[in-house]
Amino acid sequence: MNSSTFNVQTLGKSTLKSPIQLGYDKGDGIYNYIKDEERILYEKNYTSILKDLKEKKTPISFEKAGPRENIFFEPSKTKAGIVTCGGLCPGLNNVIRSIVMELYYRYGVEKILGFQYGFEGLIGKYNHPYIELTPEVIDEIHLYGGSILGSSRG
């Protein structure tokens, strides 16, 4: 592993202004955009990080997730997909519901697909139909356990 192991490839420069209105100043009570250069360290051991720095190595890190000020895709022309994998966990329907609500109401994405039964739902030979996820479909799913999409392992 080296410092480029977890780099995320991009499709091009993000030139569209994000439709969500966030802050720029820490401590103003408004969630801030994430800058592209923000990273999360892979290694949590202080001694290991110091060793990398002394050897003039860039510590291994992940791109920090979160909303960006500029985005690549035009939300009104975007289709989004959600898939749940690796088994069930508490609150999965809450996560699905939150993603749909954020995409639909904050970003303006109108076509959101839910792929059933984990990665199998992405493979045509299994013939698992996708579910069109709208605010109406997901309105009360947080009241139920499991995942509206199902899941699979392996």
Regions found by a protein language model. Name each.
Residues 1-154:
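Metallocofactor- and cofactor-centric catalytic cores in central/energy metabolism, strongly enriched
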